[in-house]
Amino acid sequence: MMIPIYIEEKKYMVEDTKNVLEVCLSLGFNVPYFCWHPALGSIGSCRQCAVKLYDNLHCVPDSKHINFGRLVMSCMTPVIKDMYISLFDKELQEFRKNILELLMVNHPHDCPVCEEGGNCHLQDMAVMVEHTYRRYRFTKRTHYNQYLGPFITHEMNRCITCYRCVRYYKDYAGGNDLGVFGVHDNIYFGRVQDGILQSEFSGNLVEICPTGVFTDKTQSKNYARKWDITFAPSICHQCSVGCNIILGERYGKLCRVENRYNSKVNGYFLCDRGRFGCNYIHIKNRPQKLLKKQNNCGYIEINAVDAVQDCVNILKSSNKIIGIGSTRASIESNFALRNLVGADNFYSGMSFFEQERLSLIFEILRNSGIYIPSVCDIENYDAILILGEDVTQTSARIALAIRQAVRSKSDHMAKYVGIYKWQSLAVTNFAQDAKYPLFITGIDKTKLDDIAMYTYYDSVQNQARFGFSIAYAVDNQVSFVKDFNLNGLDITKLDLVVEKLMCARKPLIVSGSNSGSKELIIAAVNIAYALKRKKSDVGLVLVDHDVNSIGLSMMTSKSVDDVFNTLSDTNNGNAVFNTVIILENDLYRHASVAKINKMLSNINYLIVLDHQYNIIQDKADLIFPVSSFAESDGTVINYEGRAQRFFKLYNPQNYDKNSDILESWKWLYLIHDTYVNCTRVKAVNIDYIIDSIACCFPELKKIKYASPKSNFRVHGQKLAQSTHRYSGRTSINANVNVHETSTPINDNTMFTFSMEGNSGNYSKKCSYNQIPFVWAPGWNSPQAWNKFQDQIGGNLYPSDPGVLLFDTGQENKCIDDNLYKSINWLKFASNSLNISKYTNKWIVAPYWHLFGSEETSQNVECIKNCMLNPYAMLNILDAKYINIQENMYIKFTCMDQVLCLPVKFSMDLPKKHIGLPMGFPGIPVFFSGMYVSNIEMMEAP
């Protein structure tokens, strides 16, 4: 309900559930604070956010009634109808200044050497309250700084005891290895002893901390102050969630990765893989030059004109041209390859089974009518079932949202007794450890088990059987698989799951492709369909593996196995010339060595475009070095069908005139235009490609609304990617040439690679939401996001970036069966899901890891430091049966590939399964669900 309040004698209508601090910030007032955070709520520990509250309107703050008001902490004070607040009272200003001086008693005077300088909330607040002189002249407290791992630097002496770090790490993220120790003015925030922080979300401490206690260790190698950095809005490419990030560069080196607020996706937080896993763009063995194979005896460098012409000559001499796309390449790059080779010759590059699962997920997104919630929507569900997907390792930001959904029961319980959600300590004390039900099925333990009501560990086949059982129990008219063998399943637990899902106001079903089972996906949809028939406001989340898995699935349904079959059929004794073009894809992750070698024997030319080195490049005839996501523009589509744009941070040619690196789509269009003798008046830009995509794929026509076009201007200006305080622009290249270089030109987007442009995006009348850097007058730190939102924690102005491509039935809460006539494909579910009875073979169970399973981030040095060594996981009973002890080595064969790995034991992994860390070097992702044979013990290599 909206109520009137008065701030500085002016009337405002505000929500009655908010606190005074939140209301003031939403209205654009500058109120200093430290301990409060929009995602964490209020505890009132810093005393910095004081305001003056008057009893009534007649007690205005003038000389006559100067003592009528009282100081209150705005973060702990709920708004009340007709309350009168002063923000600029003299007594109040003096109080704030004194509080900040007390907080600074033990804070070192090290701003010039602190890496938080220029991006520091403490600096902002000191300026805001006009604290300039410190009277404390005695010894300062000193602390021991801990080693917290390769991601975060610890400098405890800068702490002002706001308690934000432990409230986030323990209460919000569910970590248990960071705590608070000591009493009085000797408080310590850290671990019991030195060691790597175990939470997958520890990197958010860097932005949560208002001072420099926790800083980004990975930034130190290429450090630059915030005002000297060029920024660009981008999308994290490390999983299918598509979190919004801000990239920063100086001297052509990535020096900063920050969270970019989006109320529909990642909110205020990122996972550690997304925050720290981007530096692969500077890996030393990255392709940098155009290379051509010379008579099978090595490569020579060639120029761009010759490379394009050589490629065209190859294509013109070929009878068959095949293009293999990539789930880590943008929609535009994949389309450019498809445009070059033709729709019939364009393949996804995924294995047959992975392509089958993704095509199924795409069909569900397009036709099911079941609502697919965003990451932040997930936090509003009150019963969750996870089928076979270890989301902490495959889509960590979803796991963090699930934690908030489970713990939100406390908020709802407190609401009924008049306790507001932002009163975090009161909510915790009242509700204690109340949780909404979470049920998990999997092959082994997960990091979410600590908050689960029930966990079920078994093979993916039995997990699917369990899922179909739930669907049938919810509504026996819905499930197409009715004859279930429930041996080994706890019927009472099945009844518990069904009861909680049916009683829930908003149940959520989570599954995905990473389990390696299409039956699990079908079971998840059956459950969601059954619940929706019962008039439930159900949600369905189906996780994919890569950032653009859905986007590529919308363009083709042909897998890399179809490539092998096509080439085998094409050759078949005939003298034909075959050419394969591979776009940003390591085929050895998706197909066996034998199949790839056979493909190579059936082709005459291999052309590779990539920004990462992989073994397939050693077989290539031409290698085109292409831009990484930080050096290019493009669109990707996340798991919910949300199209999001990422923007070029810098042009490699700006720092190296001899660089051959171009965007994939730019190389492919150069080749295409030369191949078809097309002369363009104007070079192809990304707007042209997006318009072409919209014409070819009606389901992708909305991607043009994911971002303004390149001709977008604000007051006739492009948007600046650097702050107006950017220094040294004219001297960056002075060591190479004393003559000042011209400002780089960006023709593809509405941004400019400089400070010269519009940077007034902090205005709430702003007409764009693609924010290159977060800054507002007086707000230099990430806390400045409050200046870009319609209300605290709300949408960005004018709306959040990105556009949903599918109408997933959010409003269809009461449906009839006619809506589902288009999803008869659910009927292909197998009536019997039998476990293999082979006694001499083992099924590969996929173990995914946040650090190591993703193709590109595993090349980053700090990620390598957190990766486990490759291993083989066995059930402890199986190990005893074959007389294997832990840490011994076993040798086995999978898909004609011989592996030798140390053994680990699990109590929960199903029998006759061998768990392998998917995606690790030497363990391709297509191993999931395959058979292992010839296990034998051996000495450690």
Curated annotation (Swiss-Prot):
Which family does the entry's similarity section mention? Answer: Belongs to the complex I 75 kDa subunit family.
Looking at the record, the residues that make up the 4Fe-4S His(Cys)3-ligated-type domain are 91-130
Naturally occurring in which organism (per UniProt): Blochmanniella floridana
Pfam families named in the record: Fer2_4, Fer4_Nqo3, Molybdop_Fe4S4, Molybdopterin, NADH-G_4Fe-4S_3
Which Gene Ontology terms describe the biological processes this protein takes part in? Answer: ATP synthesis coupled electron transport
User: Which amino acids does the record list as binding [4Fe-4S] cluster 1?
Assistant: 107, 111, 114, 120
UniProt function note: NDH-1 shuttles electrons from NADH, via FMN and iron-sulfur (Fe-S) centers, to quinones in the respiratory chain. The immediate electron acceptor for the enzyme in this species is believed to be ubiquinone. Couples the redox reaction to proton translocation (for every two electrons transferred, four hydrogen ions are translocated across the cytoplasmic membrane), and thus conserves the redox energy in a proton gradient.
Which cofactors, by name? [2Fe-2S] cluster; [4Fe-4S] cluster
According to UniProt, the name of this protein is: NADH-quinone oxidoreductase subunit G
**Chain sites annotated for binding [2Fe-2S] cluster:** 35, 46, 49, 75
User: What's the Enzyme Commission number for this chain?
Assistant: 7.1.1.-
Assembly behavior: Composed of 13 different subunits. Subunits NuoCD, E, F, and G constitute the peripheral sector of the complex.
**A single Gene Ontology CC term:** membrane
Which keywords are on file for this protein?
2Fe-2S, 4Fe-4S, Iron, Iron-sulfur, Metal-binding, NAD, Quinone, Translocase, Ubiquinone
The segment(s) forming the 4Fe-4S Mo/W bis-MGD-type domain are 229-285
Residues reported in the UniProt entry to bind [4Fe-4S] cluster 3: 236, 239, 243, 271
Sites where the protein binds [4Fe-4S] cluster 2: 159, 162, 165, 209
Which Gene Ontology molecular-function terms are recorded? 2 iron, 2 sulfur cluster binding; 4 iron, 4 sulfur cluster binding; metal ion binding; NADH dehydrogenase (ubiquinone) activity; quinone binding
- Catalytically driven reaction(s): a quinone + NADH + 5 H(+)(in) = a quinol + NAD(+) + 4 H(+)(out)
How many cofactors are bound and how?
A: Binds 1 [2Fe-2S] cluster per subunit. Binds 3 [4Fe-4S] clusters per subunit.
Q: Which residues form the 2Fe-2S ferredoxin-type domain?
A: 1-91
